[in-house]
């Protein structure tokens, strides 16, 4: 059975696979982050969100996997076999857990739409030949800001609020102001 754990969240395993394996922090760092930011919600008997539920499940799976790894470490006599199991867990299962934890923590922190937009942006960036792409990859925490800049105000700062001098405003607000001043006098 081929189950995609990201499907109900609008993402796919393939979308996350564009991010290199060294992109994801260690499981320990991700667990510490989840605990620091969401401990109360994760330990609560109440349902908070599907991301909290998925995060709980990933944390529980990692705990069970560590229990199994400890058992294997204590019961496998052959050091070569033990190393094979440990390497497999760290390389394959560890990466999947790191991806899951990162995805759900990021969705809770930045919002699902921002994370999905980031994954698509990074996927486009990484598949673009180096000669034709910007030197730096998109950054998740600044994505909404840079997306607005690229789409609407190419070359301008994102905070610019004053209209350009060529644009003229409708005369009606000025008339209203002048009429109200006259009535106050």
From Swiss-Prot:
Keywords: Capsid protein, Cytoplasmic inwards viral transport, DNA-binding, Host cytoplasm, Host-virus interaction, Microtubular inwards viral transport, Phosphoprotein, Repeat, RNA-binding, T=4 icosahedral capsid protein, Viral penetration into host nucleus, Virion, Virus entry into host cell. It holds the Pfam family Hepatitis_core. It is found in: Virion; Host cytoplasm. Residues 136-185 are annotated as: Disordered. Its main location: virion. Phosphorylated by host SRPK1, SRPK2, and maybe protein kinase C or GAPDH. Phosphorylation is critical for pregenomic RNA packaging. Protein kinase C phosphorylation is stimulated by HBx protein and may play a role in transport of the viral genome to the nucleus at the late step during the viral replication cycle. GO terms for cellular component: host cell; host cell cytoplasm; T=4 icosahedral viral capsid. GO terms for molecular function: DNA binding; RNA binding; structural molecule activity. Residues 179-185 are annotated as: RNA binding. InterPro entries: Hepatitis_core, Viral_capsid_core_dom_sf_HBV. Changing residue 48 to A: No effect on dimer or capsid formation. It comes from the Viruses. Changing residue 107 to A: No effect on dimer or capsid formation. Changing residue 164 to A: Increases nuclear localization. GO terms for biological process: microtubule-dependent intracellular transport of viral material towards nucleus; symbiont entry into host cell; viral penetration into host nucleus. Residues 149-178 have a biased composition (Basic residues). Signal peptide: none annotated. Belongs to the orthohepadnavirus core antigen family. Self assembles to form an icosahedral capsid. Most capsids appear to be large particles with an icosahedral symmetry of T=4 and consist of 240 copies of capsid protein, though a fraction forms smaller T=3 particles consisting of 180 capsid proteins. Entering capsids are transported along microtubules to the nucleus. Phosphorylation of the capsid is thought to induce exposure of nuclear localization signal in the C-terminal portion of the capsid protein that allows binding to the nuclear pore complex via the importin (karyopherin-) alpha and beta. This is Capsid protein.
